[in-house]
A protein has these predicted regions:
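N-terminal flexible segment immediately upstream of the FAD-binding catalytic core
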Residues: 2-62, 79-112, 262-270, 317-345, ...
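FAD-binding subdomain of flavoenzyme oxidoreductases
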Residues: 103-256, 453-455
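C-terminal substrate-recognition/cap domain of FAD-linked oxidoreductases
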Residues: 25-33, 220, 226, 230-404, ...
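Activity-critical C-terminal alpha-helical subdomain
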Residues: 180, 427-460
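Alpha-helix capping/hinge segments and adjacent helical runs
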Residues: 21, 410-422, 435, 450-454
């Protein structure tokens, strides 16, 4: 065995002496922790630690400091942009899997909050809450872990009404690289006390500390929910209609766009018979039947004035479930439509009034570059994704497309990422987006993680 390999074997043995069977070197486990949802290659870590509690997290970090081995926190594995993989292939790296830390520690219905461990998924949390009349609203589509959602500042289909993770996390417990445990935030709706370190850690992608406890805000389950499915002659007209809805001040709960290619893939994948035209999925939540019927009526009038071809209203839970299944399955429907391809997902955000312009630009460069891509997203908050299918050897062209779209978004006062994070794939745009502030981000990283042990090579 080469000396380096022998040193690593001895090191892992010392880790196992502390954590025992919680440490895995199984090839299948390593492979599962060396990928995310869309990074084009697998980069396995040297070992995976399945932490059961804060003591395990601290013990793992102590070993990492002693051995000078970096660590990547891992939740449900639904991350994007290479956030979960080592910064380079073959780099010695440990994966800290938090999925066993999945308890609901406390629910306070009277205060509309719950305290959870990081490994619980949003679906599991809402199952635990089903008898309280409350729910956790942040819905990124994937059944992500709450800790991972906090680490990426996740958002999704309901953000337009309920906000993303920063708006729905009241407090955090984090373990720093030096093993110190910090408790950030208080279980209150607002505070003006001190610097907001809680929000600094939300969206930090495990580069500043390991999240070990999350206090989340809960919301009443809406008594009445109606959903509209609205088809348009073109995707730009659909985007313009979405802006009209937002400008009307109607209390929309979800406002999602799926283009013609996305609808076609849904029809084939799920056996639906939707008209193969660009579509808006619009949802309203209300406490009274009369109010929601008024909202739906006004929305339908707005849509028809904006050029809608057809408006279908889903009033039953079965109809709504089928409709949102279609929206959430677009990615897998496209994978099914283009088998054997590599998939790149963009994540730009622009001010609401600029969404139609960026949608039109996206269509233009897809055509110019001769690429297959579907435009899907949360246009109610200015965020949409382009799902691009290319042969593996064309991955560089897909990244070129992504770069052109990011730079156009920045020109329109937007951002390179609304919810997926920077990871490995968008670091090149950080200076362009943040200017001199990027150096202060580097200083913060050095302050919290002076040895660069926590998810190195990401964001900065």
């Amino acid at each position: 065995m080469p000396k380096e390999g022998m040193r690593m074997a001895v090191s892992i043995a010392t880790l196992k002496s502390v954590l025992g069977e919680k440490v895995s070197e199984s090839a299948s486990v390593l492979e599962a922790h060396g990928r995310d949802e869309n990074f084009p290659e697998v980069r396995p870590p040297m070992a995976v630690v399945f932490a059961a509690d804060v003591a395990d997290v601290r013990a793992t970090l102590a070993w990492c400091r002693e051995q000078c081995v970096p660590l990547i926190p891992f939740g449900a594995g639904t991350s994007l942009e290479g956030s979960l993989v080592p910064y380079e292939a073959g780099a010695p790296m440990l994966s800290l899997d938090l999925s066993r830390m999945r308890r609901v520690l406390e629910v306070q219905p009277e205060n509309f909050l719950a305290v959870v461990e990081p490994g619980i998924t949003r679906t599991a949390l809402n199952t635990e809450l089903r008898h309280t009349g409350l729910f956790f609203p942040v819905d990124p589509g994937a059944d992500a872990s709450i800790g991972g959602m906090a680490a990426t500042n996740a958002s999704g289909t309901t953000t337009v009404r309920y906000g993303g993770m920063r708006q729905n996390v009241l407090a955090l417990e984090v373990v720093l690289a030096n093993g110190e445990v910090l408790r950030l935030g208080r279980p209150v709706r607002k505070t003006s006390s001190g610097y907001d370190l809680k929000d600094l850690f939300i969206g930090s992608a495990g580069t500043l500390g390991v999240i070990t406890r999350v206090t989340v805000r809960l919301h009443p389950v809406p008594e009445h929910v109606h959903t509209l499915r609205v088809f348009f002659p073109s995707i730009v007209e659909a985007a313009q209609a979405a802006y009209a809805v937002m400008a009307s001040a109607l209390p929309v709960a979800r406002l999602e766009l799926v283009d013609e290619l996305g609808i076609r893939s849904i029809n084939r994948y799920l056996g639906r018979g939707y008209e193969e035209k660009p579509c808006l999925f619009v949802e309203f939540h209300s406490s009274t039947a009369a109010a929601i019927e008024d909202e739906v009526r006004l929305a339908e009038e707005l849509m028809r004035e904006a050029g809608a071809l057809d408006v279908a209203v889903a009033r039953t839970s079965e109809e709504r479930t089928a409709q949102w299944e279609a929206r959430h399955q677009v990615y897998w429907a496209l994978v099914n439509l283009f088998p054997g391809q590599t998939y790149t997902i963009t994540d730009t955000v622009v001010p609401l009034a600029r969404v139609p312009e960026l949608v039109a630009y996206t269509q233009e460069i897809l055509g110019e570059m001769g690429m297959e891509g579907s435009i899907v997203g949360h246009v109610g908050d200015g965020n949409f994704h382009t799902l691009i299918a290319t042969p593996r050897e064309d991955y560089a062209r897909a990244q070129e497309f992504s770069g052109r779209l990011v730079r156009r978004a920045l020109e329109l006062d937007g951002t390179s990422t609304g919810e997926h994070g920077i990871g490995l794939t968008k670091r090149a745009y950080m200076a362009e987006e943040h200017g001199a502030a990027l150096e202060w981000m580097r200083r913060l990283k050095a302050l919290f993680d002076p040895d660069n042990l926590l998810n190195p090579g990401k964001i900065l």
